[in-house]
């Protein structure tokens, strides 16, 4: 018995068209140019994108209809947003260069190795640093930081910093007022 994909022919066709549209109409623009155009393309394919969200041209989005980005959310250069299930990026949250958001996996105890999917949530003011991996079903809570190259396979508590493989607690995140006020 061969591998059976969980995706319908309609889904595969929709993803093919999306990939061609993004490659031809968004990728040619350098870095931060044409943000409105890129948001419009994502919205045309069902993404829920705030007018201030930032998506770089080199970002890969598997299924835009399963992506939600709030105000000032950012998917930076080279981010791989493999959203077989939904991904929600909160207000002022940043996913930095070449990070990998992976909502899919396989059931290793299933002899047929069927695909499993679970949503990812990156809450307000969280930061997923460069080349970090966020696994299926993970919530990165408000204000949390996932250090560069962290492998995050469990939820991250609010206002904490995690890092390593697998990611472990490093310290609490404390904001200071750089303007000198109270």
Where on the chain are the PLM-derived regions?
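Beta-rich strand-turn-strand
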Residues: 130-154
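Short conserved AdoMet
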Residues: 50, 139, 157
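Short, Lys/Arg-enriched, disordered terminal segments
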Residues: 1-3, 180-182
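Flexible, glycine/small-residue-enriched loop-and-beta-strand segment within the central core
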Residues: 28-39, 57-70, 74-139, 165-166, ...
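Acidic, glycine-centered active-site loop in nucleotide-sugar glycosyltransferases
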Residues: 158, 163-166
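A transmembrane-helix-recognition feature enriched in membrane-embedded lipid enzymes
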Residues: 2-52
């Amino acid at each position: 018995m061969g591998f059976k994909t969980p995706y319908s022919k309609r889904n595969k066709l929709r993803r093919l068209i999306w990939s061609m549209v993004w490659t031809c109409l968004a990728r040619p623009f350098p870095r931060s140019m044409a943000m409105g155009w890129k948001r419009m393309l994502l919205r045309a394919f069902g993404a829920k994108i705030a007018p201030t969200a930032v998506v770089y041209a080199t970002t890969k989005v598997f299924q835009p209809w399963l992506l939600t980005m709030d105000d000032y959310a950012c998917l930076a250069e080279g981010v791989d947003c493999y959203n077989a299930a939904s991904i929600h990026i909160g207000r002022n949250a940043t996913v930095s260069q070449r990070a990998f958001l992976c909502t899919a996996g396989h059931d290793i105890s299933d002899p047929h190795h069927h695909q499993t999917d679970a949503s990812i949530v990156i809450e307000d003011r969280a930061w997923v640093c460069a080349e970090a991996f966020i696994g299926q079903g993970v919530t990165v809570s408000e204000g949390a930081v996932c250090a560069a190259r962290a492998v995050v396979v469990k939820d991250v508590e609010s206002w904490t910093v995690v890092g390593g493989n697998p990611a472990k607690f490093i310290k609490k995140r404390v904001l200071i007022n750089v303007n000198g006020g109270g």
